[in-house]
Amino acid sequence: MTHPLFLEPVFKERLWGGTKLRDAFGYAIPSQKTGECWAVSAHAHGSSSVKNGPLAGKTLDQVWKDHPEIFGFPDGKVFPLLVKLLDANMDLSVQVHPDDDYAKLHENGDLGKTECWYIIDCKDDAELILGHHASTKEEFKQRIESGDWNGLLRRIKIKPGDFFYVPSGTLHALCKGTLVLEIQQNSDTTYRVYDYDRCNDQGQKRTLHIEKAMEVITIPHIDKVHTPEVKEVGNAEIIVYVQSDYFSVYKWKISGRAAFPSYQTYLLGSVLSGSGRIINNGIQYECNAGSHFILPAHFGEFTIEGTCEFMISHP
């Protein structure tokens, strides 16, 4: 495969969703409560599909199974990552995700979920929940039972451009007024701890998963802070956010024309802002804010022209 795979996202309506995915990127969203864009997804709950080339119309899940050469003949049976855009028009539930070992045992062999967030935009006084203040499981449980959420939850002020690494076992929640790009393990397993006593459209409170959450949550909280590393490569600024066992994440900021080498691994790309073109072997591939693509393994040397920002990730 010698060309990028551009992808058609899948959209998810959520109790807490809004219209920012349409307003910021021009997507045709299904409703005024659209919370998630599954941009690069091969998950059974919603697989994105290829928009261009001979594989157009195929789901990413199909391509992963039928064309391992695109991905460098990987060992795993499951596409490892999931890239989302999230419109937190309201607060998300306070939740936690299991690690691989727990999910394999208790969630039908699924992957665990370590994730990360890049804050694309947010309101002036925006915050998120990352971690808690309990020292022991007994204290954690007591604070839940007494409803002492203000005393339990660790709140952090945020601004556009912030990056957060959220390992499995970390209590967390996005809060209202936040537009986020999320890169995560390919999992849809969530254990809700607190949902603000909200009801869904049927007037029912959403299910909580306190028992499972207590089994997987990290107590006391461990803050995984990653200091970004900035590199200048010609007309590109490369910010290295994280290189972990699960994924590596970068931001490529292009101003003009920047040359890149051939990468042995495949790359997942999302255009955050601006517009540009990827040039390989004399062929140009246009991309704009809201475009999502996969560069195949051993794609070859390429150039990006334009004024744009990409979030790039790989396993």
Swiss-Prot record:
Gene coding for it: gmuF
Family named by the database record: Belongs to the mannose-6-phosphate isomerase type 1 family.
Protein name per the record: Probable mannose-6-phosphate isomerase GmuF
Swiss-Prot/TrEMBL keywords: Carbohydrate metabolism, Isomerase, Metal-binding, Zinc
Residues given in the record as Zn(2+) binding sites: 95, 97, 115, 172
PANTHER family: FRUCTOKINASE, TRANSCRIPTIONAL REPRESSOR MPRA
Pfam families: MPI_cupin_dom, PMI_typeI_cat
GO molecular function annotations of the record: mannose-6-phosphate isomerase activity; zinc ion binding
Active site as annotated: 192
Co-factor requirement: Zn(2+)
Biological role stated in the UniProt entry: Seems to be involved in the degradation of glucomannan.
Cofactor annotation remark: Binds 1 zinc ion per subunit.
Organism placement in taxonomy: Bacteria, Bacillati, Bacillota, Bacilli, Bacillales
First-level EC class: isomerase
Enzyme Commission (EC) number: 5.3.1.8
